[in-house]
Each structure stands twice: as C-alpha cells, then as structure tokens.
Amino acid sequence: MDTQAITIDEYNNDGSFINLYMNESIGEWCAYGFSAYGLLLFCKSNGYNALQSFSKGMQMPCLIITKEVLMQLLQNTTDITEQTDSHIGIRMPEKITMDAYRGWVKTLKGKLPEVYKM
C-alpha cells in the first residue's frame, strides 16, 4: 500500500468519498480516515461486518472489509470515481457528519487495540 497516497487522498477528502486500498499483507480491502467512517456507515446500514481499529502507523481510523462486502458495496454504488487493482474511489450520496466522525475516532483510540500494522 502506498501510505503517502492514502494520506493525501484523505487530506483531500471532504467527507464525500470512500477510498479503499488493497492491503496485500492481509489480502483485504482497507479504508482510512473519513473513508473508513463512510464505509462503516454503509456496512452498518446493510448489516455487514467490518473490522475497525485505529492505525498507529497511519494515525487514522481504519476499517477492513472482505471481498464479499466490497462486491456488495460496488453493486449498490452508482458513482465509482476510480477503480484499479489496488484502489477504488467512490462518491457517497451524502457527506459524513464531522461530529459523529470525531466521536467514533475518540472511541477507537480509547478502547480498540491495533490488530494489524497498516
């Protein structure tokens, strides 16, 4: 994974996008920062499981989904902005709520251990 590209993408994300990255070391798709929260909302509203944590290496929240959840996301999405073997960009119908995002990050930092080095 290109950590610099992830950092830049999330810096430029105004809360309207989900950027997903293939993490080759675990073989699953990951989202960071605002993207992770947007993806969490999608997973919760559709009853999908996801692993959530705070990445110490990236200094951002992280969400990991399986390929099956990714396929469901892509089937329910009409605005895919980019799709390669290692990165998928999706425009969400609505921006995330910043207060809710900050509360989620606080929760992750406070109680969830870092499961994988990301």
Regions found by a protein language model. Name each.
Residues 1-118:
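Basic, polar low-complexity surface loops/patches
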